[in-house]
Amino acid sequence: LEMESGNTITTSSEITILAPQVVHAGRSAADLTEEATFTGCILTMVLVNDVVGVGGYLEGELRARMNITDQAKDIRMELHSTEKSGDREDESVRQRVSLEKDVQLASERPYVWAFSLPVPERTLPTVQSGRTSVSWRLKAVVDTDTANAEYHLERKVQIFTST
């Protein structure tokens, strides 16, 4: 503040504190597990965490128990982003990692694939503000030779930035 004479009475500063979303310890494995049942298999995704900073990693396991024997062309994890602004919407695959290719999956046998999917360092965080939003989904895909038998499972994840 200044007086009419030009003498400064007080000065002020603005401080902005940015903090990542708080993740509470003690979340159960069930909180971080997603499961889908298909005629041909049961697909389960178990995450280490579903809230990650840019440049970090989404990690966990993809599990499958086959009800039929099937040939998988590709088993992969994908990170999808959806950006909405008003009536416009843009969805894209931001990251993809193949866990295994061309493998026969036998019935009644459990399969487990560990994964570590990097989150891009330069990206938008999860945000919802009026008619503008950015959201993220982690998708597990078991792409098979059987017609129309792509097994997939999705889970919303949160991405944050820090300075």
Where are these regions (language model features)?
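C-terminal beta-sandwich interaction modules and adjacent acidic
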Residues: 1-163
